[in-house]
């Protein structure tokens, strides 16, 4: 837990900064949904999604390359994760970040119907997969379980939302 908390602090700090981009457009997206036609909404959504992918993709690559050197410098070599664990942490960061545009539009436009059971399914799947994978892959298995549960539920369900 102590090792992960260092990575969680750093990844969470980057996530908070990038999340402000989408927090800033939430009201405008709500107004867009109330005043514009479906074509314009889709165009703005695709632009926001593209920007989100670039921002979170660039940040994920930077985190992958810079997390271990920073943790070693700040906390010491004994607090390092293997590169494979850092990779899956960065993949989780990227996947969750690329969902921000969809979540912003969903929240602003009230499109909650499609994912009403998603949280329950994702939590159950995360628990089962993490328990199964931790036996073979230790810490990496827990993060792989989280990644797989996100891919198998959130990404799939959020693609059903018609923006």
What residues fall within each predicted segment?
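Short runs within selected transmembrane alpha-helices of multi-pass transporters and secretion channels
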Residues: 8-11, 15, 19-23, 65, ...
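Short membrane-interface helical motifs at transmembrane helix boundaries
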Residues: 58-77, 132-136
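Helix-loop junctions and terminal segments of transmembrane helices
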Residues: 7, 11-49, 53, 103-108
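Alpha-helical transmembrane segments of integral membrane proteins
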Residues: 55-59, 87
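Helix-terminus/linker motif at the lipid-water interface of multi-pass membrane proteins
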Residues: 1-13, 28-32, 68-78
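Membrane-interface helix-boundary signature
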Residues: 42-46, 79-82, 86
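Short helix-kink/termination motifs in transmembrane helices of multi-pass secondary transporters
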Residues: 24, 48, 52, 61-65, ...
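Conserved short cytoplasmic inter-helical helices of the MFS fold
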Residues: 37, 78, 110-114
């Amino acid at each position: 837990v102590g090792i992960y908390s260092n990575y969680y602090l750093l990844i969470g700090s980057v996530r908070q900064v990038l999340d402000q981009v989408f927090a800033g457009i939430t009201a405008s997206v709500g107004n867009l949904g109330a005043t514009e036609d479906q074509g314009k909404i889709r165009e703005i959504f695709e632009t926001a999604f593209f920007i989100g992918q670039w921002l979170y993709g660039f940040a994920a690559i930077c985190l992958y390359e810079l997390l271990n050197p920073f943790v070693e410098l700040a906390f010491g070599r004994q607090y390092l994760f293997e590169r494979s664990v850092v990779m899956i942490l960065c993949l989780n960061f990227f996947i969750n970040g690329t969902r921000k545009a969809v979540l912003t539009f969903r929240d602003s436009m009230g499109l909650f119907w499609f994912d009403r059971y998603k949280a329950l399914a994702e939590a159950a799947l995360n628990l089962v997969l993490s328990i199964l994978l931790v036996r073979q892959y230790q810490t990496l298995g827990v993060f792989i379980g989280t990644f797989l549960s996100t891919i198998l539920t959130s990404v799939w369900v959020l693609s059903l939302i018609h923006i």
